[in-house]
């Protein structure tokens, strides 16, 4: 998965939903890791 970009307060949750895995947030960029 590529990174998801969001300014949402629930960035990690949105990233996990987008990617179907876990989300790690680094500033405004959320990196998705599939499990």
Curated annotation (Swiss-Prot):
Recorded superkingdom: Eukaryota
UniProt KW Cytoplasm keyword: no
GO cellular component: extracellular region
Tissue: Expressed by the venom gland.
Any GO MF annotation of the entry: toxin activity
SUPFAM superfamilies listed in its UniProt record: Scorpion toxin-like
Subcellular location: Secreted
Keyword annotations of the record: Chloride channel impairing toxin, Disulfide bond, Ion channel impairing toxin, Knottin, Secreted, Toxin, Voltage-gated chloride channel impairing toxin
Family (UniProt): Belongs to the short scorpion toxin superfamily. Chloride channel inhibitor family.
Role played: Toxin with unknown function in healthy organisms. On glioma cells, interacts with chloride channels (probably ClC-3/CLCN3) and MMP2 at the surface of glioma cells. This complex is then internalized via caveolae, thus inhibiting the chloride channels necessary for cell shrinkage and tumor propagation.
The name this protein goes by in its record: Peptide P2
